[in-house]
Amino acid sequence: MLQEKESIKQANEFAIERVFNAPRHLVWKAFAEAERLAQWWGPAGFKMEVKKLELSPGGTFHYSMQSSDGFIMWGKFVYLQIVEPEKIVFILSFSDENGAITRAPMSATWPLEVFNVLTFKEHDGKTTVTLKGHPVNATEEEIETFRNEFEGMNQGFSSTFDQLDEYLAKLLFDHS
């Protein structure tokens, strides 16, 4: 039964990995400090604002992203585990401006909560960031919606990681 549950979880798990040409401590700071996150988090073309960032178990990252046409989306992480500089475990949700969990603006059947694990591994001065996520407390319909959006999530996180790549390159250039 446990093995069956594990294989179901894996089938419903989104994963993306990126190697950044920067040391792990800098990549970690880009995820851990509000002023750094505001420089790169979210899709290209969106203006990011950090309302709150408390990187500790039970803490939150509450933010908004505004598109060029003025559309605003709110999101929230609730941190479950922080192992600096190796791992961040959190629940990701769409939210309103007060931090209350809401439905995704693009889908009425998107899961309300997505469990995520971010890992940071350094090798030869480069850092591999791996993100894995799966719905929690979700209906079958929400799980199916999540699974059907793997390609879109891959594009979205690739764009976000492109911005992180640019941010880190600028940071390293400015300090060289």
Task: Explain the meaning of each model-derived region.
Residues 27, 37, 61, 79, ...:
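Hydrophobic pocket/interface hotspot
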Residues 11-17, 24, 60, 74, ...:
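Intrinsic-disorder/low-complexity, polar/charged segments enriched in Ser/Thr/Lys/Arg/Asp/Glu/Gln
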Residues 1-47, 163:
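Hydrophobic ligand-binding cavity/cleft-lining segments
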Residues 20, 65-67, 94, 133-135:
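Short beta-strand segments enriched in hydrophobic/aromatic residues
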Residues 15, 35-78, 175-176:
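Short beta-edge strand/loop motif at the mouth of beta-sheet-based domains
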Residues 51-55, 62, 69-124:
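Hydrophobic-ligand binding "helix-grip"
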Residues 166-176:
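Short, highly charged C-terminal tails/helix-capping segments
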Residues 100-155:
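Beta-strand/loop substructures that line and gate deep hydrophobic ligand-binding cavities in soluble
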